[in-house]
Amino acid sequence: MLTRRSLMGSATALALFMGIAAPAFADPDAALAKLQETVLSKGPSGEDPSPASDVVLSDEELAKIKEMGATAAIVMHYGGNDWSQAQINGLQTQFGAMGIEVIAVTDAGFKPEKQVSDLETIMAQSPDIIVSIPTDPTATAAAYRAAHEAGAKLVFMDNVPTGFVPGTDYVSVVSADNYGNGVAAAHLMAKALGPDGGEIGLVFHAADFFVTKQRYDGFKATIASDYPNITIVDEQGIGGPDFSGDAEKAAGAMLTSNPNIKGIWAVWDVPAEGVMAAARANGRDDLIITTVDLGENVAISMAQGGFIKGLGAQRPYDAGVVEAKLAGYALLGKDAPDFVALPALPVSQDNLLDAWKQVYSTEATENVKASMQ
């Protein structure tokens, strides 16, 4: 699905609302360094973020949890990327340390009806805990409500079902600084374009999905407020489930309609792969691409000095660990913060291998290492 947005969007309005009278050039390197010291995102209902470092379980609390013999299910929106696998790895590792058995891991393929079915199937096993990310906050709300009313303790990644109240309907929500990662991708785009700037395009997620909208808003507001030498000339949305294929079509249309485009931002790594394919098909080896999420394919491109010049990375493994600990809070009856966020991680070729360790808690793959120039 392709949709096109007006080029005067909410992010420009946000920049004006924040009192930015006239854009002034930013120093991308200084802005990127400062970004890692704070969290810019708010929670789904406007909650202030709590730091992940505050979520801790004592040895005594861990011992109590182990005695419970609790079970958990992980209900994913989509399992086909490195981010999802890292979340699952973090969850399984921490649940194992807590003596909690993971009885199911599901992949909805970004289809709300499949996720509803997954939840119904899982509830037949009566898990004590469900950790999940809703594909659609409205379409899945009734299924999550039924799980909550049946006694499952809910911890969410990134997004929450419509009408759910923290501390009442669910334990907590954990997220990366998605607004901050959009900001990081904008500064990295500006750095790669250089002082002359130029025309760019955006490939956004055309869905009611809180975190991808935050990335879009962060990227667009930063370009509007900090880089008057950069002009967004085209935007197209993708709805999936073939996000790479949809992005290839969207980017191809952009490059045909706007031959002077120097760069394209993609909302996460899988669409960025489609943008790379479009660049190759259109003979645009000079195209600059920035994105969010450190997947292996975009990391290989970055390592090779290819299309991907920079990205804002989440910390999905660490997020999974925090989500499991928050589930432990619920088992203990311990008060949990409403919204926990991990700071953005700007990634370029210079820090790629170190960033991989931070994101995945493991060494970079051999494919990434072998691609480093």
What are these regions (language model features)?
Residues 2, 24-373:
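A residue-level marker of the well-folded mature domains of exported/periplasmic proteins
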Residues 10-11, 221:
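A periodicity- and composition-biased signal for non-globular, repetitive helical segments
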Residues 11-19:
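Bacterial N-terminal signal peptides
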